[in-house]
Amino acid sequence: MSNIDKERAIAAALAQIEKSYGKGSVMKLGQRPNVDIEAISTGSLGLDIALGIGGVPKGRIIEIFGPESSGKTTLTLHLIAESQKKGGTCAFIDAEHALDPAYAKKLGVNIDELIISQPDTGEQALEIADTLIRSGGIDMIIIDSVAALVPKSEIEGEMGDAQMASQARLMSQALRKLTASINRTNCITVFINQIRMKIGVMFGSPETTTGGNALKFYASVRIDIRRIGSIKDKEEVIGSQTKVKVVKNKVSPPFKTADFDIMYGSGISKEGEIIDLGVKLEIIEKSGSWFSYNKIRIGQGRENVKQYLKEHPQISNEIEKIIREKSSAITNINLDQTEE
């Protein structure tokens, strides 16, 4: 078959597919109107940089997992707030029945516009999620959490009944159904997950996430979040030092990490990240306990500098912009070196 005949055959096949399944069902990748992946900020400057595209990708499945009280829900509430700032409509499937509206409001979530559901069973939760995603009007949906998606058979059964892998089967079936709708509607779907210990593991990490392996495969981004220390004001604990690791990333190089502070009552400390990343990238100068920007001293001690940046948002925004530009340039250089 000559090249002309091949092209005619392909064109005829594409025309037949489009006639059967609609325009846009098949095309050459270069013809796609939006090749670049859009992203929504996580609310953490360091994590946005670690993810490589400035946030979590639209139209993808995201898994956020970690131990108890590590900041999983806080991070997802920041995601909702950032999406709402850009005019997005968000939904929260609260399978754990533990969402605190007052805390969400403090983190910048518009609770009047947030769609919330507190389902009774795992099937109900995932059906609600499917209906909302298929509507095409939802920009982000949070499912909190996979561990709380209890199958109907388990709820209706006796307390001691063995329900072997029923949750894993439920998740596998749901993700097969959801994944095409998520991509088509460009909806960010975030699953919060918990950690369990595998029994009898001799080598490697005994930690695993709940709900089987399906979510590990379907997720484009998997974020491991851990509390690594406390932030104290004299004797009072006022926050947590948090470390996140991007353990899977289909849209950028994985295994990058970010550290940030989660302050009780106000969430991720943007100012703390600006100081740490500013010093690391030599945008902010540190001499002893003094910090300087553009040769002007902006404070002594990290907490005082944080307060200064809160009171001077124009300087804070200026430093943040430089950090994002510098980090983007460094990422591009690293990618070019990898390709060589």
UniProtKB/Swiss-Prot annotation:
One of the GO BP terms on file: SOS response
Localization annotation: Cytoplasm
Keyword DNA repair: yes
Top-level lineage group: Bacteria
Presence of keyword DNA repair: yes
GO molecular function: ATP binding; ATP hydrolysis activity; ATP-dependent DNA damage sensor activity; damaged DNA binding; single-stranded DNA binding
Protein function: Can catalyze the hydrolysis of ATP in the presence of single-stranded DNA, the ATP-dependent uptake of single-stranded DNA by duplex DNA, and the ATP-dependent hybridization of homologous single-stranded DNAs. It interacts with LexA causing its activation and leading to its autocatalytic cleavage.
Family: Belongs to the RecA family.
Name of the protein in question: Protein RecA
